[in-house]
Curated annotation (Swiss-Prot):
Cofactor stoichiometry and binding remark: Binds 1 zinc ion per subunit.
GO-annotated biological processes: L-methionine salvage from methylthioadenosine
Enzyme Commission no: 4.2.1.109
Function, in words: Catalyzes the dehydration of methylthioribulose-1-phosphate (MTRu-1-P) into 2,3-diketo-5-methylthiopentyl-1-phosphate (DK-MTP-1-P).
High-level lineage: Bacteria, Bacillati, Bacillota, Bacilli, Bacillales
Protein name, per record: Methylthioribulose-1-phosphate dehydratase
Amino acid sequence: MKQLFRQWYDLSEIKKELTTRNWFPATSGNISIKVSHEPLTFLITASGKDKTKTTPDDFLLVDHVGVPVLETELRPSAETILHTHIYNNTNAGCVLHVHTTDNNVITNLYSDAVTLQNQEIIKALDIWEEGATIHIPIIENHAHIPTLGENFRKHIKGDSGAVLIRNHGITVWGRDSFDAKKRLEAYEFLFQFHIKLLSIQGGVSNGANSYS
């Protein structure tokens, strides 16, 4: 029970911090944190809640397939399947899914992936080589959630990572809440920088094709 309360507090603090950045507009987004490994359980944001508010109903505990562990009237997000795929296939401890203007714009500039390079902040992703290049996959935003989940699952490669969904934000996961938040901050910085650079240069650079 102590672990549940500890993880609840941790997730609540993350929600508060991301809310101050306006990364949960119009009740969008969802975040989760692992509570136990065997059996797998995790806390996830309840569907349709105003994340600028802090209430006892912010999160609910679900199992390895996203079904509530305790009797509740709360519903987990429809995208809980993305979280279950991550937790069932990795040792990740936290998953963050947010909608920002920048990450949505990026998915309209590129088709299957966005490539970013030569930025010091890439080291926050535990990539240390000089002039490092990263590739972030972009998948289509299917209304059929099982199809979205299956396409998402193909890009889960390790205990940390990120996938962009076209016009539907980014999902980032990490070894724990600190790692996941750090990675999310790094990706959002990179997106913001890239978009500003393109606006100065006058268009999509480096031979990439606009997807819009």
